[in-house]
């Protein structure tokens, strides 16, 4: 099934990028049918290549082929099912892989407006544009992001608006 825009835009609350999140509705209304054009562009230009704005600089040992999961995620009413969430797999417990995941986390926060990145989670760090006044939470206790970095775009980023 081809991708379709199923996003419901939220209201800006003063963050660098507006956050759009599905809440309390049935999963079928969030089925985008595939990965969004904006997420595909982000993955191609940042994860699989050297980003045009390479600040902070991408590590030279960043793997050319890293495991990535996007749509459908767990097929729930979430950003993966809407085609605008991606998990890029790096092991937080491995020092080298943590360095690579930390670079991607830092790059996403620093360049959030370019791709309309609304949130990033990796290991003990979590950042959302409109959460904690846009500051990184350095002591996130979520626990389920120790083997991957989670990145999500808002509706505008997903649909290249």
Mark where each language-model region is.
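Secreted/periplasmic proteins that engage bacterial cell-wall peptidoglycan
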Residues: 2-133, 146-154
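Short proline/glycine-enriched turn/loop segments at secondary-structure junctions
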Residues: 136-143
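Short, charged low-complexity linker/loop segments at the C-terminal edge of domains
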Residues: 156-161
């Amino acid at each position: 099934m081809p991708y379709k825009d199923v996003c419901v835009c939220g209201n800006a609350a003063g963050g660098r990028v507006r956050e759009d999140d599905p809440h309390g509705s049935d999963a079928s209304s969030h089925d985008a049918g595939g990965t969004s054009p904006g997420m595909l562009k982000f993955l191609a230009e940042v994860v699989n290549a050297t980003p045009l704005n390479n600040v902070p600089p991408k590590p030279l040992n960043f793997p050319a082929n890293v495991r990535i999961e996007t749509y459908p995620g767990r097929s729930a009413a979430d950003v993966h099912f809407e085609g605008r969430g991606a998990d890029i797999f790096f092991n937080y417990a491995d020092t080298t892989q943590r360095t690579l995941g930390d670079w991607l986390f830092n790059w996403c926060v620093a360049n959030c407006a370019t791709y309309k990145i609304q949130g990033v989670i990796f290991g003990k760090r979590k950042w959302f544009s409109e959460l904690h006044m846009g500051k990184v939470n350095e002591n996130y206790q979520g626990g389920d992001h120790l083997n991957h970095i989670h990145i999500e775009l808002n509706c505008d980023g997903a649909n290249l608006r």
